Swiss-Prot record:
It comes from Streptococcus pneumoniae serotype 4 (strain ATCC BAA-334 / TIGR4). This is Endo-alpha-N-acetylgalactosaminidase. Residues 602-893 are annotated as: Catalytic. The active site is at residues 764, 796. Ca(2+) 1 binds at residues 577, 579, 581, 583, 588. Residues 1-39 form the signal peptide. It is a peptidoglycan-anchor. It holds the Pfam family Glyco_hyd_101C. One of its GO terms (cellular component) is extracellular region. Transmembrane segments: none annotated.
Length: 1767
């Protein structure tokens, strides 16, 4: 073998070993692991392979645009913790990511030799215009590859001034997705490279980054509010000189993924919403090369332009190898009527095949070894010939050293033109019981391999010898196919393939294997076959081997279930010219291959599922209930004239999409439950609708009953591996544990619930490795579990489930993933399976390559039921006919011939590359009908490149933009009767087209129908002339043509929904009884083409009434209708049960709809009118009586000019009791415990906190202990009481409305007052607030109006309480009648107490939960106002960080309010409360340290934006840092105070991460007001982030302070100075405890009094004193007053006749008032620890009035509180 193989990128290692007298060189495996592999050894990994076999694969084509280098083995990346929050540049540059460079480095010395630059080639990468960020670009060529060598220089650093490079056309795409795919070599000196990619780059402080330094690969993101980087175990950085294929995708929703050489660099990262929003308009993608000291980054990026590069030559001399020696071999033959095989009796080896006089070799050299668990064994073989076609081999396999003791039976059988290689029996003599524990996993037969035993080969001595194989590629620019001539000499080959064929000019052969092997990720996954070049004598042979099989496997000693085992099997098929083109090649082999291949379950349905879409339910909103989805199916059935449909139900379970994962049988109750789901399944069959569900087998949420500690995946450090965080913080599971512990049972539970009829299961996420091994074998086992229930298998990724899946979401949803992560890009694979899968690259021109008008199309998926907010019905239908009808038409045929054109040059996504387009594809069906698809031009710059001509049996059925295509199948694929056969017509352009009809259509008349959502309309009778018709019709409008007249099927709308046509889809109101002016009620369409009822311009009340059917007697129901009222006229829903009438109404709608999956949200493309939607559901709750025969529902609108819109009426059982503890809508105290919410978050609706989004507020279900306080450090309960609470996840610092009530849900009547109470949990102080508003709260693009809200911030609930807290507020209805209450996200940041990332999310610091909402109408009294105010103010007076003077004034005012008379008037109470509010606003913070405002000047050397003021801002995340160029150690930081100020010491707070600039030795000089200098020094401070103190030992009245770091830590040492904070402490006078001696003495004296009145006075004083003490209200003046008051009390015997009694300075309540009547404020009011918990800035501007009130009210308060005592 050629020594050059070792120098290739693949680093393929070939070893020789003797087999008797022959020496065979074989290649068996790739060096590396799949990115989806986790804890255990998996198929294809290095650990799985025999020591004597090869450990990598060779590249078939060195420069074909793919890097086949084997990935390195990386540690399990997990999901390590991250730290969120504002960061400085330096903190984010820890771990040597962003470090300054020396001003004068020693030298620039890239490792690579100086390149030779071709004169005619220009660089593709350019350095940026900013001079500080410029590097160098040169062109170099090495080993037949051209590169742009990018280098950083001495002027660069690794932070603000790295070398940056850009490439024309490489930007974030129009959908907001960023995709980077590049091949590069690292030419830096070892360990000195700092390279990576900036995505959505604004500047070095605002971006997303993926790259590496000496410690390995990491991600990082930066924004003004949130910045962090990856802190987990890293994948190692590339070795110097290594070739790397880097692929990065950043989706518009913030999901970041990256791999290098097909190894995932980290688990999926989801950017915080704040970061994603901040960067959403940034388009730049740049490469970065950093410098540090004399360390330079030098990388060579492979260019797109490889023209003119001298490639490596094939070996010049012929190769020779050992000759065949069969002298000791005994051969036999087995044969069928057409195929003969020569076989070795000593081993199941085929020497040669003969077919019709032509031959193909098998394994020509002798081979006799099996590899069990990667241990090579020469078995003892017993040969037995069964009959002429079949031979059997009994193998005894022993290896005592490795505990192998087994027998295996292998059968070779010839069947027609096939050779079957089957392991028919395996006996493991070790005791192995599936599902049970085994003491030593070595006793398992984990893997079985016959690598080295080629099943079929081709020789260079044969004419036309070729090998053709397909690997996985999802890059639209790069085909996964290899086409290799087998010659001598030729390049070495050892590589894994999904499909492989060998051929000569006479015969072609294909091989199938059920091996579920992965040699790695990407192109190395799904490698069931291994192709290997072997030199025998003077000929080269390329043989196809089955890759390794998996058999018995286990998880930590638990043997996997029996069903995971699959007996090894492989088949060879040999054929001559199968497509009759007089040429034999791989295509003939591929046609024959279909006779031996596996067929994924349900593949027969694929061709007929033309109308795929997603119906979305999310966040408890039940946007698309099951039975409403049924109406959507009927609507599409009409609009497509009966095409088959596929509906993926995202959110069928729990509270909707991405909630309750792993509990597959938890059918969503709010969307209809099991009963409605089964009805949907059954009724959908009639319309050929195939239903599937979205599930997740990789992560779980705490609400799921399957969430438990054992199943959860952990990181290497023992922390949990967190997954998706939206409604809840998910945690990844260990998929292997799940498999070993009964995953199958969950599918079986679902099957029991639903019965038969469900068509497919779509497995989300699986394939990215977040649950461990998601490779070929693990995926096949998962698919088998699903198939076992009778369900088709579907998956998310284009590369996922290649063996079993029939639908791949990222392939079909063309906007997903970017050009590197689409469908399967392999002509070989598509040739074989085009009719079986929707897995192909579709037509999405901007992706380029295969995506630029694939001839066979490719599914293009759109939606109209809420997925990604897509509710554009017309757009869905247009796309279906423009893209999908012809794609599905082709799938009714199998491909028989594929002709490529000449390569074209394409430029897109920052790449210029060669692509070879298919120019002509032939297809045939079982009846020999022939379809030919031809591209009109091979010129990519011609419009005709994107046009095709399609003929059926020679007759044109598509010509460019127009098609008239026959469709002779019903929705389920059954052939139509002749009179129902039809043709679809569609043209993307207007204009006349002429068509020849088939002979059996050439009658005098045919009938054309326009297709709409009402079915076939506008019938036209067309005359056929000379067998032709001419059509001149609308563009982008579907039509259907029939031989004879047709009618539409009768639709029974809204089956099971108790009303006819809940969504007004029938196009008529004839089912309603209309009173009033019926002409004012009509069906119209929204901007999203959604049908609605509109009532407008009516001069009298208009009502529409319909009977509700199918109701149960004496049963509680809820009914709602969506309403958008643009009029002030009252719009109502009324239910009359015959015994009772229930009505709910709304005036003008005031809340925009922000629910993304709702068809009526306020996105422009879904809006009602005027680009807005105020649709919200309006409910009536009612109870039926004994007679349900005449229950009616009425929609009405009173007279008015403007429009009211209604849509989506839904009636269903509901057991809530919200109205005075009764079910029916009515008066009384409103109570919502969230236990029986009908739908949504009633009585609230979602606010604009996220804009139109899949909102993060939902009904949370209890699963103790995982949803509750304590588990995994959780601080708050997700569920407060009962089984359900309302949870908001992570919506802090938004300054926007989270949710609100609306009048139709609860009406605060004008002038009436209500007490609103609720229990709540909040993870941080004042991040959420209770608000009262009126009218529309405008947010988002309409601006925010928080200043109009009455806002009450809510403290956290866990630092001082073991359970949720209760909040009470008084709300008075505005005269406008549109008052509402809600929860608001303030501008305050959460306090995560040092936790970060998933821990911070899971533990609830950012969350808010509500329960037990109660709204009670009350008669407002002054007492109520005072009690409510006290609850709000008492937490504030408990604070200790305000000055005594300002706090005492507040305390005394609050105490006086607490002592107010019960009969205080409302006006008096409000006046007193206003005064207290002014005092609260006037509180003055204590000064404990110097702040920036205390200084007249702050002078110090500093890096830009990292000045000395940062050390006085109270934020440890910001730094003072000297210049990153170094050289500032020993330079002073000088601080001059405005006024001499007393200080007592310095506390130095180092940076929180990293060590650059940490002070080691310091000198501190403090100059006092007299000019005297006080000098202090410190030496050898340790290098950590703990504070360091210098205690002056005295108080100095300082005027100037000079701090000098004379020695510092960090890279290189003594280069920088830095500080997070410099805290110069001020002397603190300890507050003297209140002197109670006078009071106590007076009390002792007063207690001796005997008069009853005096005793009551004393008791009253004691009670008031106790109340004041308990509630932190006591002041010195109050103590003095209480003592004086007691001292003046005297018994009647000693009282003077006319006593002079001081009028009380402080009000005292009577003793009766104190006994059992004073609220226990300690119980109800929490006392936060810091003032920020009570009085943070809201982020809203304060009015001038408020400022004036604060100053004036101080004077007013004195009149109330301070009274001069008489002598």
């Amino acid at each position: 073998m050629n020594k050059g193989l070792f120098e290739k990128r693949c680093k393929y290692s070939i070893r020789k070993f003797s087999l008797g007298v022959a020496s065979v060189m074989i290649g068996a495996a790739f060096f590396g692991t799949s990115p989806v592999l986790a804890d255990s050894v998996q198929s294809g990994s290095t650990a799985n392979l025999p020591a004597d076999l090869a450990t990598a694969l060779a590249t078939a084509k060195e420069n074909d645009g793919r890097d086949f280098e084997a990935p390195k083995v990386g540690e399990d990346q997990g999901s390590p913790e991250v730290t969120d929050g504002p960061k400085t540049e330096e903190e984010l540059l820890a771990l040597e990511k962003e470090k300054p460079a020396e001003e004068k480095p020693k030298e620039d010395k890239p490792a690579a030799a100086k390149p030779e630059t071709p004169k005619t080639v220009t660089p593709e990468w350019q350095t940026v215009a900013n001079k500080e960020q410029q590097g160098t670009v040169t062109i170099r060529e090495e080993k037949g590859v051209r590169y742009n060598q990018l280098s950083s220089t001495a002027q660069n650093d690794n932070a603000g001034k790295p070398a940056l490079f850009e490439k024309k056309g490489l930007t974030v795409d129009a959908n907001g997705n960023a995709t980077v795919d590049l091949t590069f070599k690292d030419d830096s000196e070892k360990g000195k490279s700092r390279f990576g990619v900036f995505l959505k780059f604004k500047d070095t402080k605002n971006n997303v980054f993926v790259g590496y330094d000496k410690d390995g690969w990491f991600w990082e993101y930066k924004s003004p509010t949130t910045s962090t980087w990856y802190r987990g175990s890293r994948v190692a950085a590339p070795e110097t000189g290594s070739t790397n294929r880097l692929s990065i995708t950043l989706k518009s929703d913030g999901q970041l993924n990256a791999s290098n050489n097909d190894v995932n660099l980290f688990d999926t990262v989801t950017l915080p919403a704040a970061v994603n929003d901040h960067l959403k308009n940034e388009k730049k993608i740049l490469l970065k090369a950093g410098s540090y000291d004399d360390e330079r980054t030098v990388v060579s990026v492979k260019t797109d332009n490889q023209e003119g590069v001298k490639t490596e030559d094939t070996p010049a001399e012929k190769e020779t190898g050992p000759e065949v020696d069969d002298s000791k071999v005994t051969y036999d033959t087995i044969q069928s009527k057409v195929l003969k095989a020569v076989i070795d009796q000593a081993f199941p080896r085929v020497k040669e095949y003969s077919l019709n006089g032509h031959t193909l070799p098998g394994q020509v050299q002798q081979f006799n070894q099996v590899f069990i668990n990667n241990h090579r064994i020469t078995p003892e073989v017993t040969y037995k010939k069964i009959n002429e076609t079949t031979a059997e081999y009994l193998m005894k396999l022993r290896d005592d050293a490795h505990l192998i003791n087994a027998e295996m039976t292998v059968r070779l059988q010839v069947v027609d033109n096939q050779l079957h290689f089957d392991v028919t029996k395996i006996v493991n003599h070790n005791q192995v019981t599936p599902g049970q524990k085994i003491d030593d996993e070595s006793k398992l037969l984990s893997s079985i391999s016959f690598l080295g035993n080629a099943l079929v080969s081709v020789s260079s001595n044969q004419t036309g010898a070729k090998f053709d194989g397909a690997t996985m590629s999802n890059n639209t620019h790069v085909s996964g196919d290899d086409h290799i001539d087998v010659t001598n000499p030729m390049k070495d080959l050892a590589k894994g393939y999904m499909y492989g064929f060998v051929s000569t000019d006479k015969l072609a052969a294909g091989v199938w294997s059920n091996s579920q092997n992965s040699y790695g990720g990407g192109s190395n996954d799904w490698t069931r076959l291994t192709a290997y070049k072997e030199t025998v004598g003077n000929a080269n042979y390329v043989g196809i081997h089955s890759s390794e099989w998996q058999w018995e496997k286990a998880y930590k000693g638990i043997v996997f279930p029996e069903y995971t085992k699959e007996l090894p099997s492989a088949k060879v098929v040999i054929t001559e010219d199968a497509n009759a083109d007089k040429n034999v090649d791989w295509q003939d082999g591929a046609i024959a291959y279909r006779s031996i291949m596996n067929n994924p379950q349900g593949w027969e349905k694929v061709k007929d599922i033309t109308a795929y879409r997603i119906a979305m339910n999310f966040g408890s909103q039940a946007q698309n209930p099951f039975l409403m989805t049924l109406d959507g199916i009927k609507k599409i059935n009409l609009h497509t004239d009966g095409l088959g449909q596929g509906v993926l139900l995202k959110g069928y379970g729990s509270e909707g999409h991405d909630s309750g994962h792993l509990n597959y049988a938890d059918i969503g109750k709010r969307i209809g439950g099991v009963e409605d789901f089964k009805t949907l399944i059954e009724k959908a069959k009639k319309y050929g609708a195939h239903l599937g569900i979205h599930v997740n087998a990789s992560e779980t949420y705490p609400e799921s009953k399957y969430f438990n500690e054992k199943i959860l995946r952990k990181n290497p450090d023992g922390s949990y591996s967190y997954g998706w965080n939206w409604l809840d913080q998910g945690i990844n599971i260990d998929a292997a544990y799940d498999l070993a512990h009964g995953r199958l049972a969950r599918w079986e539970d679902l099957k029991k619930k639903l019965g038969d009829g469900l068509d497919f299961i779509y497995v989300d996420v699986w394939g990215n490795g977040q649950s461990g091994d998601n490779g070929a074998w693990a995926t096949h086992v998962l698919a088998k579990e699903i198939n076992k229930q009778g369900w088709r298998f579907a998956i998310e990724w284009g590369h996922g489930g290649e063996y079993d899946s029939t639908f791949h979401h990222w392939a079909a949803d063309l906007t997903y993933g970017g050009y590197t992560n689409k469908g399967i890009n392999s002509a070989i694979t598509r040739f074989i399976r085009n009719h079986q899968k929707d897995a192909w690259v579709g037509d999405y021109r901007s992706y380029g390559g295969a995506a630029n008008y694939p001839l066979l199309g490719g599914y293009s998926m759109k939606d109209f039921e809420g997925w990604q907010g897509r509710s554009d019905y017309n757009g869905y239908v247009t796309n279906l006919f423009a893209h999908d009808v012809m794609t599905k038409y082709f799938q009714h045929f199998t491909v028989s011939k594929w002709e490529n054109g000449t390569p074209v040059t394409m430029t897109d996504n920052g790449s210029t590359y060669k692509w070879t387009p298919e120019m002509r594809v032939e297809l045939v069906d079982a009846d020999n009908n022939k379809v030919v698809v031809t591209r009109k031009s091979n010129d990519v710059n011609s419009p005709q490149y994107r046009e095709r001509t399609v003929t059926l049996n020679g007759r044109v059925i598509q010509d460019g933009s127009a098609y008239l295509t026959p469709w002779n199948w019903d929705a389920n694929g059954k052939k139509l009767s002749t009179d129902k056969e039809k043709m679809y017509y569609f043209n993307t352009q207007a204009g006349a087209t002429t068509w020849t009809l088939p002979s059996d259509w050439a009658k005098s008349k045919v009938y054309l129908y326009k297709l709409t959502d009402q079915g076939k309309t506008e019938e036209q009778e067309l005359t056929v002339k000379d067998g032709k018709i001419t059509l001149d019709l609308l563009a982008n409008q579907p039509y259907v043509l029939y031989r004879s007249k047709q009618t539409n099927p009768e639709m029974s709308w809204s089956e099971g929904m108790h009303i006819y046509d809940q969504g007004f889809n029938s196009g008529t109101l004839k089912h309603w009884t209309i009173s009033g002016d019926a002409s004012k009620a009509e069906i119209v369409k929204s901007q999203g083409a959604n049908d609605m009822l509109r009532i407008q311009g009516n001069k009298e009340k208009v009502s529409l009434t319909q009977k509700l059917t199918g109701l149960k007697p004496n049963t509680k129901y809820a009914v709602y209708v969506g309403v958008d009222n643009r009029s002030n006229a009252k719009a109502s829903i009324t239910v009359n049960t015959g015994e009772k009438e229930v009505t709910t109404y709304t005036n003008k709608s005031l809340a925009l709809n922000y629910v993304k999956a709702y068809a009526h949200n306020t996105r422009r493309d879904n809006a009602t009118v005027d680009d807005t939607s105020y649709f919200q559901n309006m409910y009536a709750f009612f109870t039926t009586g004994a007679d349900v025969s005449n229950v009616t529902l009425t929609l009405s609108r009173e007279a008015g000019d403007q429009a009211t819109y209604f849509d989506e009426i839904r009636t269903f059982e509901n057991n809530s009791s919200m109205y005075g503890d009764k079910h029916d809508t009515g008066k009384g105290t409103f109570k919502q415990d969230f236990e029986n919410v009908a739908q949504g978050i009633f009585p609230f609706v979602v606010g604009g906190v996220e804009g139109v989004e899949d909102n993060r507020t939902h009904l949370s279900e209890k699963h103790n202990p995982y949803t509750q306080r304590g588990w995994n450090g959780k601080k708050v309960d997700d569920v407060i009481e009962g089984n359900w609470s309302l949870k908001t996840n992570g919506l802090v610092s938004r300054r926007n409305l989270v949710y609100q009530t609306i009048p139709q849900n609860f009406r605060f009547e004008a002038g009436k007052t209500y007490r609103v109470t609720f229990e709540y949990e909040a993870g941080s102080d004042n991040t959420y607030a209770f608000v009262v508003g009126k009218g529309e709260f405008q947010s988002g693009r309409r601006g925010t109006q928080a200043s109009n809200l009455e806002m009450h911030e809510l403290p956290n609930t866990w630092t001082d309480s073991k359970k949720a807290k209760k909040a009470t507020f008084l709300v008075t209805g505005a005269e406008t009648g549109d008052t509402w209450v809600g929860i608001y996200s303030t501008g305050n940041a959460s306090n995560t107490r040092g936790d970060s990332g998933g821990n911070a999310n899971f533990r609830g610091y950012n969350d808010f939960m509500m329960d037990n909402l109660q709204i009670e109408e009350i008669t407002l009294t002054g007492k109520m106002l005072t009690e409510n105010a006290l609850k709000n103010y008492l937490p504030t007076v408990a604070m200790t960080n305000y000055t005594k003077e300002s706090m005492d004034a507040l305390k005394e005012a609050v105490f006086n309010l607490s002592q107010a008379d019960d009969d205080i008037s409302v006006e008096e109470a409000r006046a007193e409360i206003a005064k207290i509010e002014a005092l609260k606003n006037a509180l003055v913070q204590k000064k404990t340290a110097l702040v920036a405002d205390d200084f007249a000047s702050l002078t110090a050397p500093a890096q830009a934006q990292e000045g000395l003021a940062n050390a006085f801002d109270g934020n440890v995340s910001s730094l003072w840092h000297t210049s990153w160029n170094g050289g500032d150690v020993g330079k002073p930081a000088t601080m001059v105070l405005k006024e001499p100020t007393e200080i007592t010491g310095l506390r130095y707070v180092p940076r929180g991460s990293g060590s650059n600039g940490n002070l080691r030795d310091v000198k501190l000089v403090v100059t006092d007001e007299s000019g005297k200098e006080h000098t202090f020094t410190a030496t050898d401070w340790p290098n950590n982030n703990k504070p360091k103190d210098i205690d002056f030992g005295k108080t100095i009245k300082a005027k100037k302070i000079v701090l000098t770091g004379t020695k510092t830590y960090g890279d290189g040492g003594d280069k920088y100075q830095s500080a997070a904070e410099l805290i110069f402490t001020r002397p603190q006078v300890a507050e003297t405890p209140l002197d109670l001696s006078g009071y106590e003495a007076a009390l002792v004296k007063a207690q001796k009094l005997t008069d009853k009145d005096n005793q009551e006075e004393v008791a009253s004083v004691q009670a008031s004193m106790k109340y004041a003490t308990d509630n932190h209200l006591l002041t010195e003046r109050m103590v003095e007053y209480f003592a004086d008051y007691l001292n003046q009390l005297k018994d009647s015997a000693t009282k003077p006749d006319a006593p002079t009694v001081e009028k009380p300075e402080f009000k005292l309540r009577s003793l009766a008032s104190e006994q059992g009547k004073t609220p226990d404020y300690k119980q109800e009011i929490a006392r936060p620890e810091t003032p920020e918990q009570i009085l943070p800035a809201t982020g809203e501007s304060q009015s001038d009035t408020a400022l004036i009130l604060a100053s004036v009210s101080l004077a007013l308060s004195a009149l109330f509180v301070v009274k001069t005592k008489k002598d």
